[in-house]
Structures are given as structure tokens and as C-alpha cells.
Regions:
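Carbohydrate-active catalytic/glycan-binding domains of CAZyme proteins
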Residues: 1-188
Length: 188
């Protein structure tokens, strides 16, 4: 069995990019040359690549723009794993930068991942901050979750690409595990 690993680096080009190479998942042995497959959508510091395969397309999702108030998540499809990737013409799929996020309680969104659940719903999980004033967020980066829809082959984060503090969603219900005993003895 083999796998593909996406990572970051400039590999002698002098320009940050996303590299991909084949590897043996059991040994970690690199089985192919490292190839730059993207320089991102144009935002600074493309990093945190994730590769997905859906409906015969490979999707490369990146964090771009740095981790503060310019942070964003971009995505592009390709028919082959090594590109070329054409990024979403509607801009980042997730961001609170510029006019899109003015007044949003959650800022600096990015470094995301997309998953589908057992019910076939799609979700995006992302880092973000809750500012307490201009350029200040005392809780650091937190994790947020939002629903995502696929529209004409593109992932679209609900609420205009903004995370919300509260949202409705059809989450699968887990069985509740009852405690074996509730006779805890404390003597301190």
C-alpha cells in the first residue's frame, strides 16, 4: 500500500508552496520525488494542506493569509493528485477578513478540515478566535464547527463562510454511557 503526503516548503524555488510525494505508510519511506503542486490562491503563507477525493476530483484545501485577522481557508479541485489545482473563483470558502467578517464574533478562521458524518452531512472544523477588543483575544485559538454544502462541485460553508457562536445541525446521536457506580467516597 502507498499513500500521498502533502506538505509545505520551497524546495529551492525561493517561494513557499505545497509539495506532495508518495510514501509507504507502514515505513514512512518516501517513494517519489517531492513535487510542488500549488502556490496557493494568492494569499500569503499557504500552509496546512489537506487532500480530499470526492466524485472523481482531488481537492486541495489550504490555510492562507497568516493566522491572525487575514486568515482564510481556500480550496481547489484537480482531476489528478499532482494538479494543477484551480482555486474557487468566489474567494476563500471560510474567512472573517475584510467586509465578510466585520462584526463577526469569531475571527481569524482557518486551518480547517472537512468531514462527512454517518448521516451524509458535511462539516467544516476550523480554528478561530473570539476577540475581546481590537486585536485582542485572551483565549487563543479555539475550535469551531459549521455545516458545509456541496454546490456545483464546490464546498460552501453556510452563513456566508463565517463561523457562528451557535448553529443548528443534524448531528448523529451517540449512546449515553451510564456510570458503573455513583458511590464516590471523598474524605478531603
Amino acid at each position: 500500500a502507498t499513500g500521498w503526503y502533502p506538505g509545505t516548503g520551497n524546495h529551492g524555488t525561493g517561494r513557499q508552496g505545497i509539495v506532495c510525494f508518495k510514501l509507504d505508510p507502514m515505513t514512512g519511506e518516501i517513494l517519489s520525488d517531492k513535487k510542488i503542486i500549488s502556490h496557493g490562491s494568492g494569499g500569503k503563507c499557504p500552509e496546512g494542506p489537506h487532500l480530499y477525493k470526492k466524485d472523481g476530483w482531488y481537492y486541495l484545501m489550504l490555510a492562507e493569509g497568516g493566522t491572525e485577522f487575514g486568515h482564510m481557508e481556500t480550496i481547489g479541485p484537480s482531476r489528478t493528485i499532482d494538479g494543477p489545482y484551480e482555486f474557487c473563483p468566489n474567494g476563500p470558502i471560510l474567512t472573517a477578513r475584510d467586509d465578510n467578517g466585520n462584526g463577526s464574533p469569531i475571527q481569524c478562521t482557518g486551518h480547517a478540515d472537512i468531514v462527512d458524518d454517518a448521516n451524509g452531512n458535511w462539516w467544516i472544523v476550523s480554528l478561530g478566535t473570539r476577540p475581546i477588543g481590537p486585536m485582542a483575544h485572551h483565549l487563543g485559538r479555539e475550535t469551531f464547527l459549521a455545516q458545509l454544502d456541496w454546490v456545483d462541485g464546490w464546498p460552501v460553508v453556510r452563513n456566508g463562510g463565517l463561523m457562528q457562536l451557535e448553529a443548528e445541525g443534524d448531528l448523529p446521536q451517540a449512546d449515553t454511557v451510564k456510570p458503573v457506580s455513583d458511590d464516590l467516597h471523598c474524605d478531603f
